[in-house]
Amino acid sequence: MKNDLLFPLKTTCAPILALGMMLAIVLPPSCANAEHEGQIQILLLGDSTTEGSVPRRLKPKGPHLEKVLELLLAAEGDLPPCHVINSSLSGEYIRRLIDSGRYDRKGAKLPGLDYIFIRYGLNDRARRKEFSVNFPKDFHELLARLRRDHPQALLIPMTVIPFADEEASKVINDLVLEVAKKEKLAVFDIYPRYAAELKKGPNMLNYRRYPLARIPKQYHDLVKPFVSGSGVEVMANELDPILGHLPGWYGDRHPNLAGYNVIADETAKYLAKLLREKKAKR
């Protein structure tokens, strides 16, 4: 009796399996969509001010930029589910992203991307020779690659956050605006919101990273929980009352979690508007 039942099951399953294999071969990749079916796919490309390696080290469970952005978009209540991929790297600039092969490995083949945020310029200015000439060229090259690899995605160049002095930031951001204008792309200008938040407290959005050797020895036991390698890393202001007088204590301008939450909040507002406009056109 059992053997009689097995045979029909096998013969019935065989054509179903064959059909499934045929569909997998015939259907284009877009049918499988992205990493999570049914979700808007968002890619973040950038340097350390997007990656957030130190906050991730200090608070591994986060939530960090990409997760906060997902949560804020979900909190709107009327938007489709969103999945955010943070493919950023400390020290990176556009030329290195392309020449190192990291873009090919980590960005080119991501399926189903809908929105790509691009925020470079700080390291490009520091490391790229003839910055004012080569940075725009590199940016145009990256945009061409993104258009080729992700023709359905909306490309969103971003200005940099206040990191260098105001004059240097303007030089970078003016070039971003120039590139975007030639490419007929809208720029997401994050700079004004971040600058406005800094007026509430000039050091409230950056972590403290300081060489241990420059901290007086009588405080070494105090800072022991914050030691990482040869330095001290503090997420926010807890040691400021004791060590804030040290020269350069506030020198590292990388965002802490509060800084990344500013970026996430402003990005969520920008993206929510785009998603609603897209929905209204349907």
Go through the PLM ranges and name each one:
Residues 3, 35-37, 71, 75-80, ...:
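Alpha-helical cap/lid subdomain in secreted, periplasmic
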Residues 7, 25-27, 31, 234-235:
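Short, motif-level signal for alpha-helix interfacial/capping segments enriched in acidic residues
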Residues 51-63, 86-98, 126-133, 208:
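Acidic/histidine-rich helix-loop elements
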Residues 24-25, 31-88, 103-111:
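Serine-esterase "nucleophile elbow" of acetyl-processing enzymes
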Residues 8, 21-22, 144:
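Residue-level detector of alpha-helical transmembrane segments in integral membrane proteins
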Residues 1-10:
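N-terminal secretory signal peptides that target proteins for export/translocation
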Residues 13-28:
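Bacterial N-terminal signal peptides
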